[in-house]
Amino acid sequence: MANPKYKRILIKLSGEALAGERGVGIDIQTVQTIAKEIQEVHSLGIEIALVIGGGNLWRGEPAAEAGMDRVQADYTGMLGTVMNALVMADSLQQVGVDTRVQTAIAMQQVAEPYVRGRALRHLEKGRIVIFGAGIGSPYFSTDTTAALRAAEIEADAILMAKNGVDGVYNADPKKDKTAVKFEELTHRDVINKGLRIMDSTASTLSMDNDIDLVVFNMNQSGNIKRVVFGENIGTTVSNNIEEKE
């Protein structure tokens, strides 16, 4: 087997990825399917961390727009990400992968506190680490959490696993049949063109820390493995290609 392109990765999953066809809540069978995909890659010696959104359970911005205090709304969303992390950790444990959940908000009864050195040791020992509760502060997305934690653990790449979306396009392919898919982009392209892959804070963090970002369709079996081994199945964003006009 060829050598992997990425040896330490952070997988960013949306909360909706755990919801299955319903789109809300948590579908255990869907989580178990994702866990098996991750386990297959982990068994090849790849070091893996995860950040999971909370949009299947709660969205802070709409709640704030409806009149809820924005800070409280965001903290509520952080707790949703912890729920998702615990469910995913259980599914990974059930397929034989030693997994730890670390949270940016202390809740010792259910998870470890986030400690960078401890997270690195877990990865080096072959454990998967799931980062929950965002960065512990309101106003920051789980995209920013993914970029920050990827930088802190010195990940080679962030894998943006999307539901039914196979990359980045110049327009919404569901609405525009002429939409063109980008195979490669620079982080600068993403920022300058306003492409909504991640929010601007997350994009800048990824660029400044030279972390590749790969956007791919997670609904096709084996795609995480394909990305890790360098197959060009989605859109790769990095600092190392020629600038696009």
Curated annotation (Swiss-Prot):
Alphabetically ordered keywords of this record: Allosteric enzyme, ATP-binding, Cytoplasm, Kinase, Nucleotide-binding, Pyrimidine biosynthesis, Transferase
Regulation: Allosterically activated by GTP. Inhibited by UTP.
GO MF annotation list: ATP binding; UMP kinase activity
Pfam families: AA_kinase (PF00696)
Matches recorded under HAMAP family: PyrH_B
Family matches, as PANTHER family: URIDYLATE KINASE (PTHR42833), URIDYLATE KINASE PUMPKIN, CHLOROPLASTIC (PTHR42833:SF4)
Record-given protein name: Uridylate kinase
Species the sequence originates in: Streptococcus pneumoniae serotype 2 (strain D39 / NCTC 7466)
High-level lineage: Bacteria, Bacillati, Bacillota, Bacilli, Lactobacillales
Gene: pyrH
